[in-house]
Regions:
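Eukaryotic helix-grip
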Residues: 1-218
Length: 218
């Protein structure tokens, strides 16, 4: 987990590393290889939890809309593709492109503790219709009483495709769940979890996504 006091010094390094990984499918061992969805994994030396990557080659909404729902307004829509999500709030808006976000999750499975995460989110517009986000857990807030703290590494790249009405969405996810949930179990169960998540994201943005996220016609 990153120290909040020094996290601002690491933002550009996070963005550069995530962009390289998001664009490097060959660096991930394939787990799912469908025309509409690819999922892969790779181990890294600093954590026994694997880094996962999923890719939706075509989402039925432009990048601005998808990025708005999947990143900018995550607290409004996260429950649409993550059923464990309960609530959250913006802890601090550090700049127009950086903020600290807190979220809570309740698995609802006997013996599995509730989880929370406090993460620094950094975004960039790389080009018109190309948006990048990096997420890292930071020690800005202590875990809520009764919650185990997730140590999270995430990244998202959304690119509008030719024609302007659809986009590609790629996502990185590594979750050290903390508590008594071991890495080997998380690694084993993440494939189906991520397939379900990606398919729900696809459905959420079907037909252009929610009207509330669409820009008005000029």
């Amino acid at each position: 987990m990153e120290s909040f006091t020094t996290a601002h010094q690491r933002q550009e390094a996070w963005l550069a590393r995530d962009l390289a990984l998001l664009n490097d499918a060959a660096a991930f061992a394939p787990m799912v290889n469908r025309a509409d969805l690819q999922v892969g994994r790779r181990p890294l030396p600093d954590d026994p939890n694997h880094l996962f990557r999923w890719r939706l080659p075509r989402v039925a909404a432009p990048a601005d809309v998808v990025f708005a729902g999947f990143v900018t307004h995550i607290l409004d829509y996260h429950h649409e593709w993550t059923r464990e999500f309960v609530d959250g709030y913006v802890v601090e808006q550090l700049s127009p492109t950086a903020r600290v976000v807190y979220q809570r999750f309740e698995p609802g499975i006997p013996g599995i503790a509730k989880r929370d995460v406090c993460a620094l989110e950094v975004t960039r517009e790389l080009a018109p219709g190309v948006k990048l986000a990096s997420f890292r857990s930071v020690d800005r807030l202590p875990p809520a009483p009764g919650y185990a703290r997730i140590d999270w590494w995430g990244g998202a790249l959304c690119t509008t495709l030719d024609g302007g009405q659809t986009s590609e969405l790629i996502y990185l996810d590594r979750e050290n769940q903390g508590g008594w949930l071991p890495a080997w179990l998380v690694n084993r169960t993440m494939k189906q979890y991520l397939v379900t998540q990606a398919e729900q994201v696809q459905r959420f943005f079907a037909d252009g996504g929610p009207m509330a996220l669409r820009r008005p016609e000029p």
